[in-house]
Every structure is written in structure tokens, then in C-alpha cells.
């Protein structure tokens, strides 16, 4: 199945020296406009799916950097909060969706929601209630940046070779309205110039890799025990007062 896809005109960028990236076929980084590469906290590394947490900073604009580590072109379907960043539609990370193309060992910087052939509206971290996805009453994948990488079909491969995959779903209790409002999401930010052009690309039927980054506020990550926050304080010995003397009563006359 040959489809029409978008490719960035400028795909070579320099990544920051510190932080974290995720992936083997493609490497994914989240970089804020301050130049900081968000550190990642992996929770799963089973191929073809990889998952990690990332810390979001409210109000900060960010970009998604993807580097192709393969020796052939790959198409990347990118979804933020469950919405395809090119079409804006609900994404299932399928190979029939709108995607960006990376050349062999090439790199792309994706800064926002595509609203035209030469413009995007920036990504920025905000409350879920202010997110682009919530504007469409879609909170099904809030706080998740997902990247599916599809390698280009090689001409020597047999066309009759098929691979099947079955989507599995499970029911979860919906979060409370308060918790959802306080959760992290991605907004529809300022407009910027970002030209692309259209190319033909035939993706393989199955993604070589899928990467899921769950971004949360620092307080949430602390509460979940993903990161250690504050200084470690050993428990005081109830029979050993460091002062060495009997303290005065709370009220002393």
C-alpha cells in the first residue's frame, strides 16, 4: 500500500548533550525551548513497545526529536495526547495514518500541530483541561507522547508476506474530574513557520518499534515514586533526643 506522506525540508538538528532518549530503531527525545532534554524514566523495554515517564514543566514549549537509526527510510506516526500531530485526528498509530518521513540515519524535529504545508502551532505543557485533545472531548490518551516507526518496504521483499497484529484493549476506571483537570496535557500554542513537502512512501504493515512517553508534573512523579524528591530523613530515635536535655513543655508559665 503506497501512501502520500509529509517530509520535513530540514531534518538535521543537534541534540542536547544530556537528558535521555528512548528507542532502538528510532531514538526519541523531548526537548524544551530552554534547551533542556527531559530525562526519561523507563518502565518497560520490551520490543516492539517501549515505555517511559518524563517530567513536564507547566507552560514550557517543547519539541519531539526523532532520530532514525536504520539504514533505510522510516515513516513515523506521532500522536500527542492520542491525536495525530499532522491530521489532528484520533490516532491508533496505524500505518495508514499521516506520517513524517526520515531518511536513513536522518533526524527530525517536530514542534507542534501541523495546520498547513508551511506552518504549525506549537506544543506546550498545560493542564489537561486546556489541552488540544480536550477541545475535541478526547481524554483517552492524555499525557502520552507516542511514536510508531514504520520501515519502508524493500523492493526485494515478497509481496505475499503478511504479518498480523491484534489490538488488545482493557477497561480502566475513568479518573475523577479533579484529577483529570490537574493532569498534564499539551496545548495548541503559537503559530510558527515550518515548511514540508509531500513524498510517496510505502510503509511495512507492522511497526518496527512503538515508543510511549508518559509526561507528568513533578509532584505526580514524586507521588508515584518514579523519582525521589526531597532529602532523605532517617527516622528519629524516640528515646534519644539530639539536644541532650529535657525540653520545656509546650506552654510554660
Across the structure, where does each feature detected by a protein language model lie?
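A detector of low-complexity, intrinsically disordered, Ser/Thr/Gly/Pro/Ala-rich segments
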Residues: 1-2, 244
Amino acid at each position: 500500500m503506497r501512501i502520500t506522506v509529509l517530509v520535513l525540508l530540514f531534518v538535521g538538528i543537534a541534540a542536547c548533550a544530556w537528558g535521555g532518549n528512548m528507542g532502538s530503531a528510532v531514538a526519541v527525545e523531548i526537548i524544551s525551548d530552554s534547551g533542556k532534554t527531559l530525562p526519561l524514566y523507563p518502565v518497560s523495554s520490551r520490543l516492539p513497545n517501549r515505555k517511559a515517564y518524563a517530567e513536564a514543566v507547566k507552560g514550557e514549549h517543547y519539541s519531539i526529536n526523532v532520530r532514525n537509526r536504520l539504514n533505510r527510510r522510516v515513516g513515523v506516526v506521532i500522536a500527542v495526547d492520542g491525536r495525530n500531530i499532522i491530521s489532528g485526528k484520533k490516532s491508533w498509530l496505524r500505518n495508514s495514518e499521516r506520517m513524517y518521513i526520515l531518511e536513513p540515519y536522518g533526524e527530525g524535529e517536530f514542534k507542534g500541530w501541523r495546520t498547513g504545508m508551511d506552518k504549525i502551532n506549537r506544543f506546550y505543557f498545560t493542564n489537561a483541561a486546556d489541552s488540544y485533545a480536550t477541545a475535541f472531548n478526547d481524554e483517552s490518551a492524555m499525557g502520552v507522547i507516542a511514536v510508531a516507526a514504520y520501515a519502508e518496504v524493500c523492493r526485494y521483499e515478497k509481496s505475499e508476506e503478511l504479518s498480523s497484529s491484534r489490538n488488545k484493549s482493557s477497561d480502566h476506571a475513568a479518573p475523577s474530574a479533579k484529577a483529570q483537570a490537574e493532569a498534564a496535557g499539551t496545548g495548541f500554542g503559537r503559530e510558527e513557520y515550518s515548511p514540508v513537502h509531500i513524498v510517496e512512501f510505502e510503509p511495512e504493515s507492522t511497526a518496527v518499534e512503538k515508543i510511549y512517553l508518559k509526561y507528568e508534573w513533578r509532584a505526580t512523579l514524586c507521588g508515584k515514586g518514579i523519582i525521589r524528591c526531597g532529602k532523605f530523613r532517617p527516622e528519629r530515635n524516640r528515646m534519644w533526643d539530639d539536644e541532650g536535655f529535657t525540653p520545656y513543655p509546650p506552654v510554660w508559665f
